[in-house]
């Protein structure tokens, strides 16, 4: 038993194990975090707003920092995001009508967290998310489902970004 404890301790410290919150990319000195509206390279309506709002909501929920919704010199750090691409591809077809019945939306984004002095605290250039959604053939009841899919992707993205910034897993 005496031999098992040091071996277990050595194994856990060697594998990168750490307590929750101890590997944060956000220093304790960051009390104010600016999150301006994400930039976009995609030709899509409202995606950057959905991603920005979801990220702000997640930061408000999971951090003690005060979140500013604009680019501010008074912030201790700034999180910039960019929507790199957004594509929608038909996934399944209705054989009777010859039209698509479901689609796959793919959104690629990157984020950069910088301290007030310009030092990079966190960077991820390769967030890729997919979401499937159904379309309707009934034009009288047509509801554009891609907005709902974008909002679901934005929520997943925000959870992943904030988790990665806070926990580095």
Question: For each predicted feature, which ranges?
Answer:
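A structural "domain/chain start" motif
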Residues: 15-64, 71, 88, 117, ...
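Conserved acidic
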Residues: 43, 47, 101, 145, ...
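Surface-exposed short loop/turn segments
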Residues: 63-66, 76-124, 130-148
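Residues embedded in well-ordered secondary-structure elements
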Residues: 4, 24, 70, 98-100
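Sec-dependent bacterial lipoprotein signal peptides
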Residues: 1-15
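N-terminal start-of-chain detector that recognizes signal peptides
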Residues: 7-9, 38-40, 49-56, 78-86, ...
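Compositionally biased, intrinsically disordered linkers/stalks adjacent to structured regions
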Residues: 143-169
């Amino acid at each position: 038993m005496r031999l098992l404890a040091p071996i277990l301790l050595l194994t856990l410290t060697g594998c990168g194990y750490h307590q929750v919150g101890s590997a944060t990319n956000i220093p304790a000195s960051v009390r104010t975090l600016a999150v301006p509206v994400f930039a976009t390279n995609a030709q899509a309506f409202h995606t950057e707003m959905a991603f920005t709002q979801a990220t702000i909501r997640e930061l408000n929920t999971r951090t003690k920092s005060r979140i500013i919704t604009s680019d501010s010199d008074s912030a201790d750090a700034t999180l910039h995001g960019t929507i790199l691409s957004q594509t929608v591809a038909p996934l399944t077809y209705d054989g009777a009508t010859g039209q698509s019945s479901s689609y796959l939306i793919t959104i690629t984004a990157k984020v950069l967290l910088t301290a007030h002095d310009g030092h990079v605290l966190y960077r991820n250039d390769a967030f890729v998310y997919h979401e499937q959604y159904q379309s309707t053939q009934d034009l009288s009841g047509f509801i554009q489902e891609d907005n709902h899919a974008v909002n679901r992707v934005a929520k997943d993205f925000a959870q992943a970004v904030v988790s990665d910034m806070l926990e580095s897993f």
